[in-house]
Design a protein with these regions (language model features):
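Short Pro/Gly-enriched beta-strand edge/turn motifs at strand-loop
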Residues: 12-23, 92-96, 345-351
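A short, structured beta-strand/loop element
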Residues: 240-260
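A charge-rich, low-complexity, intrinsically flexible signal that marks solvent-exposed coils, linkers
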Residues: 234-235, 266
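N-terminal acidic leader/helix
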Residues: 233-234, 240
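Mixed-charge, Lys/Arg-enriched low-complexity segments
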Residues: 260-294
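Glycine/alanine-rich phosphate-binding loops at beta-alpha junctions
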Residues: 2-36
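C-terminal catalytic domain of Rieske-type non-heme iron oxygenases
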Residues: 43, 54, 114, 119-226, ...
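Rieske [2Fe-2S] iron-sulfur-binding domain
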Residues: 23-126, 130-141
Length: 478
């Protein structure tokens, strides 16, 4: 019932990101955009971009099942009814047999279309307010390097066994880092993140090149001198060492030297230590991209006189600017960006379902319902680096599709980030199952660390026209 309400009140009325302008560059190019049980054709015409309901007006067959190039018309493969690229009716085989059908009345139903920084948006509600009004001042946050000066270098789409909202919530905060991503704690001030909300979007800034404040009182915390990023790692919270024995097998050594073995799902095999961190077991013992197992744990070696954390952070930022200057110097001036813009994780959540990151962290996310199944979703990870030459951008990457049981590391184009997404994927199916099992039928959000999630739900209440005074949103609705 809640999913049906979302389709009626949200997906049928809200501006949503459909594709890239670069993905349909020429007349006749088209992109199929699907959300819930709705399907749209986004088409490049002689006069610009249009979006139509992807359904034949004869007997309902999809006009196109996948993206394509250079179409001269939109012809249904079932009986041959055809429309021009502008949506007007072109042809009906045996037209004499349809005396009630007038071509001028059978144009394809349109959705609103607009663009923003190289992205194409659609809105099924033809009476909706303009996209510019919906996005507000979002463009100001990306003015130093707009997305139309970047290119899509990777695009991975994975089916997840979790509702699209619960999946998205996992990427709205850094609060989960201490438990889910222990390998990030040495370089991420997770609990020191800043959260800001705007009308239809929110932002988080999680500082890098600083340690997590959770490590401040860890007396046993010490970085392994002979450690390896993906093969031998000391857990920063309890000091246990996790070593890769082989694919799927991890040795865990505690502070007293006791050893046990676990598989990469943290299932105990032997030894006196009977519990292990499932996220670190997957990180160390799970599938790993080629060449990553030998990556050492190395700290930057700053020059003399660079001693304090603030000085080291500024030095690392300067190095990143120099690296960027060599690769994107024609497009942006790295000196125009602050240390925070260069180093930190700046991630936005634009209602209802997409998340762009800042210039120097190229990640970009989108979530959609998986058809009409509220217990599953489609989670997409893209990367948008700055184009070295803004006048000669590479073509957008093709989509790699992963099933619910596929490991993220299959997507080698994501590099080490694939390992991080795999850690998140350990939690999410169990979040979905656990929400269904709750007795109290409510969840609790942190006052500050989960600000973005609170903001998301305020927007959901508003769009679904639900008053908190008369309707209870239970975990089943998430």
């Amino acid at each position: 019932e809640f999913h049906a309400l979302e389709v009626e009140k949200l997906w049928s009325r809200v501006w949503q990101l459909a594709c890239l302008d670069d993905e349909i560059p020429n007349v006749g190019d088209y992109h199929v955009y699907e959300v819930a049980d709705m399907s749209f054709l986004v088409v490049r015409t002689e006069d610009g971009i249009k979006a139509f309901r992807n359904s034949c007006l004869h007997r309902g067959r999809l006009l196109r099942e996948s993206n394509g190039k250079g179409a001269r018309n939109l012809r249904c493969a079932f009986h041959g009814w055809a429309w021009n690229l502008d949506g007007s009716m072109k042809e009906i085989p045996c037209e004499w047999d349809f005396p009630s059908v007038r071509k001028e009345d059978y144009a394809l139903p349109e959705a609103l279309v607009d663009t923003w920084q190289g992205f194409v948006f659609i809105n099924p509600d033809r009476d909706a307010a303009p996209l510019a009004d919906f996005l507000g001042n979002l463009g100001d946050h990306f003015a130093k390097c707009t997305f139309d000066r970047r290119y899509k270098a990777a695009h991975v789409e994975k089916i997840m066994r979790v509702n699209w909202k619960a999946c998205q919530e996992a990427f709205m905060e850094s609060y989960h880092v201490v438990a889910t991503h222990p390998t990030l704690m040495e370089d991420l001030g997770d609990a020191n993140s800043r959260y800001d909300t705007y009308e239809n979007f929110s932002r988080a800034i999680s500082p890098h090149a600083v340690e997590s404040p959770h490590l401040a009182n860890m007396a046993h915390y010490e970085r392994l001198e002979d450690g390896k990023q993906f093969a031998r790692y000391r857990h920063p919270m309890n000091g246990h060492i996790y070593e890769r024995v082989k694919l799927g097998l991890v040795r865990v050594i505690d502070l007293d030297g006791h050893e046990s073995h676990f598989d990469d799902e943290a299932t105990w095999i032997d030894g006196p230590i009977v519990q292990a961190d499932p996220h670190l077991c997957k990180w160390i013992g799970g599938p790993t991209p080629s060449g990553f197992l030998d990556v050492p744990l190395t700290l930057p070696d700053p020059p003399d006189g660079v001693d304090t954390p603030a000085e080291i952070r500024a030095w690392i930022a300067a190095q990143r600017r120099d690296t960027a200057r060599d690769t994107v110097g024609k497009n942006i001036d790295p000196d125009d960006f602050s240390d925070a813009e260069v180093l930190d994780a700046m991630y936005y959540s634009v209602f209802p379902n997409w998340s762009p990151w800042g210039v120097f962290n190229t990640l970009f996310y989108r979530w959609r319902p998986y058809g009409n199944d509220p217990d599953m979703c489609i989670f997409e990870v893209m990367t948008f680096p700055v184009a070295p030459d803004p006048d000669n951008k590479p073509a957008p990457a093709e989509v790699r599709r992963l099933g619910p049981d596929d490991d993220w590391t299959i997507a080698t184009e994501l590099g080490a980030a694939a390992k991080i997404f795999q850690q998140d994927s350990i939690n999410l199916p169990h979040v979905q199952t656990g929400l269904m099992a709750q007795e109290q039928q409510e969840v609790v959000f942190a006052n500050y660390n989960e600000t973005k999630i609170r903001d998301f739900w305020e927007n959901m209440f508003r769009w679904l026209e639900i008053g908190e005074t008369n309707v209870s949103i239970t975990p089943r609705d998430r």
